[in-house]
Amino acid sequence: VDPHTHVAYGGSREKEFEMRLEGSTYMEIMNAGGGIHATTRMTREATEDELVAQTTRRLDSFLAHGVTTVEGKSGYGLDLETELKQLRAMKRLNETHPIDLVPTFMGGHAVPQEYKGSEEQYIDLLVNDMLPKVAEEGLAVFNDVFCEVGVFTPEQSERILEAGKKLGLIPKIHADEIESYGGAELAAKVGAISAEHLLKASDEGVRLMAEAGVIACLLPATALYLREEAA
């Protein structure tokens, strides 16, 4: 079982590996239009059939390595049309591929570049338009958000997760990956099924997670790529 993947997306970002080796940080790459934003552009340009074809190859690789169940996140659309395209592609694959693919809506992966300076407008779109449509079509089991400095604040993240809960989506959270920012504490507060990354989680946050029964999903390969100590 792989409980945390971003398997359905367009394009690739191998050029950023060189930037990482030269010392650029995750957030520096993202703020320069790379990272999540680069993959968002390529995913918006891809058709649903192209996403299915690219994701099929990735799922084939998972299966060859003994993985039979995969959680898959959207979050490389950051608009209604492309988020739905990612989730619909995963739905098709879950029906046709040997792997069991469990979908997560992650419109809260980042604020798209066209909403820079208007973050609350994007959150309104996510809460009022994206989440209801995803729930209406039954395209996701979970609702995830990237609670991180420069992405979504704990308060914004809570709004997104609580909106999903009202629609029947189970909360998950990318927490304290780059900085200690209260993500672990928020996971406990909202009753998330899991908090993921946790490289910089506070001792208090971990204690609260344990008390609330939140699963810690640790991602050692991410720590290696970020050149950080493992959680």
Regions inferred by a protein language model and the residue ranges of each:
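Residues at the C-termini of beta-strands that transition into short coil/loop
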Residues: 30, 107-109, 220
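Divalent metal-coordination and catalytic microenvironments
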Residues: 4, 17, 66, 73, ...
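Metal-coordinating catalytic core of metallo-dependent amide/deamination hydrolases
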Residues: 34-55, 60, 68-181
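Metal-associated gating/positioning segment near the N- to mid-region
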Residues: 1-54
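Active-site-adjacent C-terminal substructures of enzyme catalytic domains
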Residues: 170-171, 180-231
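Residues at alpha-helix caps and immediate loop-helix transition turns in enzyme cores, especially N-
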Residues: 13, 82-86, 156-157, 183, ...
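Small/polar loops that bind or transfer phosphate-bearing groups
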Residues: 9, 175, 197
